[in-house]
Design a protein with these regions (language model features):
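Juxtamembrane helix-capping/reentrant segments at transmembrane boundaries
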Residues: 38-52, 224-229
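Short juxtamembrane and helix-loop transition motifs at transmembrane-helix boundaries
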Residues: 17, 41-45, 73-83, 132-142, ...
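Function-critical hydrophobic alpha-helical transmembrane segments in multi-pass membrane proteins
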Residues: 151-161, 173-174
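Hydrophobic alpha-helical hairpins/lids featuring a short glycine-rich hinge
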Residues: 84-120, 125
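A generic, lipid-embedded transmembrane alpha helix
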Residues: 50-70, 123-127
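Alpha-helical transmembrane segments
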Residues: 2-28, 32-34, 61-73, 79-95, ...
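Membrane-helix interface "capping/anchor" motifs
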Residues: 103-111, 165-173, 221-223
Length: 316
């Protein structure tokens, strides 16, 4: 067995424990401060639910990543981590997105402020050298110059970030889709031998599993149920957008050339990405505002067919 797999497993366990410890603390804090997601005619839930579950995501992921590399490198050795410009840009970007999500959950922010923060955060990545530089023959296009790849990268990351945020409408949906996508990217990077990213992804998977337990299986009456809020959905979406660009980028120094990299990356995110396009086109056709919340998402349609939240989640 490859010794690096122990790093991945250890990061998952550390993050899982961290999430299991942090989330109950967050629930108590939300109830004390009365920080709830209030029900309305558009939302599915009918009781006040704490909404700050996503606060646990980034600290747990980074804690698991750092501890795994520090502890196991001393015990097992072999893994070296270099902090390059890409890494610095990602860390700064994810902290911006995470902070915006937390502030939005606490006091509320307008969509323009969040969109600006997403755009600026995404822009840091191509400025650091990480951008979509090859379409691998899609529409007959191969190599992509920076002046096209940079705005395309920003668009893709913001698009994915908002797609996951907008589909967060029933218990476990955004988290479940993100979990499957993260697991897919984990296998992709594992196959390419890019173990540093595998450890990072595993660190996010662990806390996400802990969150999904509280979100899906805990009843509101138990006072243990929680939503991820924008702090969670925006963070997850941005990480997935970053992984999309990282895996799709043609960089022989990091990974072997694969003509299906772009297609595979999109396939892992096809449900939220396709749903947001379908909803936008539907609103456009109906002459309604594109960004006004409604009940046009796929989970709303399944619920109207008589499915329960858990059945709709399983169907999607």
């Amino acid at each position: 067995m490859n010794v690096y797999i122990y790093y991945v497993i250890f990061a998952f366990i550390i993050s899982l424990i961290s999430g299991a410890v942090l989330i109950p603390v967050i629930i108590k804090f939300c109830r004390k401060r009365k920080l709830y997601d209030l029900p309305d005619t558009r939302k599915v839930h009918r009781m006040m639910i704490p909404r700050l579950g996503g606060i646990a995501f980034l600290p747990s992921m980074l804690f698991a990543f750092i501890v795994s590399l520090f502890v196991l490198s001393r015990v097992l050795g072999g893994m070296e981590v270099t902090i390059g410009l890409w890494s610095c840009a990602f860390i700064v970007s994810i902290f911006i997105i995470y902070s915006v999500g937390v502030v939005d959950d606490l006091i509320g922010l307008g969509p323009k402020v969040k969109f600006l923060a997403q755009t600026l955060s995404a822009l840091l990545l191509p400025l650091s050298g990480l951008y979509i530089n090859n379409l691998y023959g899609f529409l007959g296009i191969w190599d992509v110059p920076f002046y096209i790849g940079a705005p395309l990268t920003v668009f893709v990351i913001v698009y994915i970030d908002n797609a996951l945020n907008l589909i967060d409408g029933i218990d476990g949906l955004a988290g479940g889709l993100a979990l499957m996508s993260l697991f897919g990217f984990l296998l992709c990077f594992m196959r390419e031998g890019v173990w540093t990213y595998c450890v990072l992804i595993s660190g996010l998977i662990g806390v996400l599993v802990a969150y999904l337990y509280f979100n899906i299986f805990c009843k509101p009456e138990s006072n243990r149920k929680i939503f991820m809020g924008d702090s969670g959905s925006l963070t997850l979406g941005f990480v997935l957008g970053f992984l999309f660009v990282k895996f799709a980028m043609d960089n022989s120094k990091v990974m072997t050339y694969r003509s299906d990299s772009l297609l595979l990356s999109y396939t892992l995110l096809i449900v939220p990405c396709f749903d947001v396009v379908r909803v936008m086109l539907s609103r456009l056709w109906a002459g309604q505002p594109l960004f006004k919340a409604d009940k046009r998402h796929i989970h709303h349609k399944l619920l109207r067919c008589g499915l329960s939240q858990h059945c709709a989640l399983a169907s999607i």
